Amino acid sequence: MFKEYDEETLKKLQRTELEILKDFLWICEQYDLTYFSFAGTAIGALRHKGFIPWDDDIDVCLPRKDYEAFIRAAKKEFPDKYTVMNAEENENYPLTTTRWMLKGTSFREEALKDIDCELGVFLDIYPFDNVSDDEKEYKKQAWDAWFWSKILILRCIREPVILGTGFRVSAVKAACRAGHWFLKTFGFSKKK
């Protein structure tokens, strides 16, 4: 689901994200970290020699070891310029991805409009972990990741964005509200 921006706003957002990317690359070079672009960022780089024209974020990945080293280095090298936002840093943050956010900026996606944490212009950072070669174990890992990501969203967002109308959508939204209430009432935390 993409938000539509006027061209000037989108270009300003993309320029700011490129500045964040330059600092990300600097850390990766200084600390000899392996990284690569991902999803729309990789497509944009190959197909458009930059951003996909409507893309509003940059996605980068690092192997888990390098991801952990990046988080430590980012806090050391740029403590006054950026905030690391993830489940460990803020229990009101509902996503499993880490965002490296430029301080002094504000950027809130529609799906995250009701969460209780400050959000700024960011770089999405994904750690890549090894998965099992055993198909059964791999499916369990994939299901666990999917399930817990949804629980984290429900913990922080009373009514997630769900497209569509009708009885089914209304029932799912009601179930989400009930799940949110349960998780908040009984103190589910990402850190537990």
Positions of PLM-derived features:
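Conserved catalytic core of two-metal-ion nucleotidyltransferases
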Residues: F2-E29, A74-D133, I151-K192
